[in-house]
Amino acid sequence: MGDAGLIVIGGATATGKTALAIALAQQLNSVILSADSRQVYRGFDIGTAKPTPAQQQQVRHHLIDICDPRETLTLAIYQAKAQALIAHYHAQGITPLLVGGTGLYIRSITQGLTMPQVPPQPHLRAQLMALGQQECYQWLQQVDPVAAQRIHAHDQVRTLRALEVYYTTGVPLSQQQRREPPPYRIWYFALTGGDRQQERCRIEARTQEMLAMGWLDEIQQLQRQYGEDLPLLDTLGYREMRQYLRGEVTLAEAIALTVQHTQQFAKRQRTWFRAEPDIHWLQATTLEAQLAEIQAQFTLCPKTTATKRRMS
């Protein structure tokens, strides 16, 4: 592969990114940098599909379990940590893998987004949280409509952060982001995940697997440890399963809601990744074929990023 660069594996949830990344990292004797905005938080393991301890023993993982759930990991902090790790491995001649479905995390590295250096404001955040997510999002639509278009109405963490930046600096977050592309080579791959029925089956199977692994116990432990008002407990999957634990829906209904909302989230992820430049969409459906397709791109594109291919 020549000089050290960066391999990115993105795509929607439940498309097999983790398995592919581990196999590729083993082939290349490399490491994995997680690009998942929930896997950074300790204790949120099963419901975020965090690589298991066994998987983490196979290949060294970074940017997992680096933050207390009561704290806020800003994009600027994530970016700084990721860039430092990339530089560390480049100095050893290693090309690391950046893997995940949080498109903004990936973009902050591949396009070099420069983020405002605004530390968390606990008192302001507490005041905003008291208003509730619906009112906060309405405020965001007024003060920073560009950011509001990028942030889902139920994404409390990013909504609060955007408002925090605005009320601290007086300048909308969307106006403070600049781009400084990195100097190293990037290979950017994404997984398609097949058709919608295949996607639904995978998501449902993964949800059942999470439950079998003890997801409900994890949620109850998190509630006991951090309280039921923890914003992360109101994120995808955790929110629906807590409805079941409160007796508001049956388990079957909670599973159906989780699958439905996860598919909706996956659609938004695909929309994001389709808009990213220089992505090679992997057409292969088996792990072995995907690895071969990636290796072929190293041969075909030795000096540039991979050619973009949109999903059909």
Curated annotation (Swiss-Prot):
Write out the entry's keywords from A to Z.
Answer: ATP-binding, Magnesium, Nucleotide-binding, Transferase, tRNA processing
A GO biological process this protein is involved in? tRNA modification
Q: What is its EC number?
A: 2.5.1.75
Cofactor annotation: Mg(2+)
Q: From the Swiss-Prot or TrEMBL record, what is one GO molecular function term? A: tRNA dimethylallyltransferase activity
| Top-rank EC class of the record's enzyme | transferase
Q: Which residues cross the membrane?
A: none
Catalytic activity annotation: adenosine(37) in tRNA + dimethylallyl diphosphate = N(6)-dimethylallyladenosine(37) in tRNA + diphosphate
Annotated residues that bind ATP are located at: G11, A12, T13, A14, T15, G16, K17, T18
Say yes or no: keyword Thylakoid present. no
* Binding of substrate, residues: T13, A14, T15, G16, K17, T18
Q: Where is this site: Interaction with substrate tRNA?
A: T102
Per the record, which residues fall in region Interaction with substrate tRNA?
Answer: 36-39
Q: Which family does it belong to?
A: Belongs to the IPP transferase family.
Q: Which HAMAP family match?
A: IPP_trans
Purpose of the protein: Catalyzes the transfer of a dimethylallyl group onto the adenine at position 37 in tRNAs that read codons beginning with uridine, leading to the formation of N6-(dimethylallyl)adenosine (i(6)A).
Subunit annotation: Monomer.
Record-given protein name:
tRNA dimethylallyltransferase
Organism equals Thermosynechococcus vestitus (strain NIES-2133 / IAM M-273 / BP-1)
Give the gene symbol.
miaA
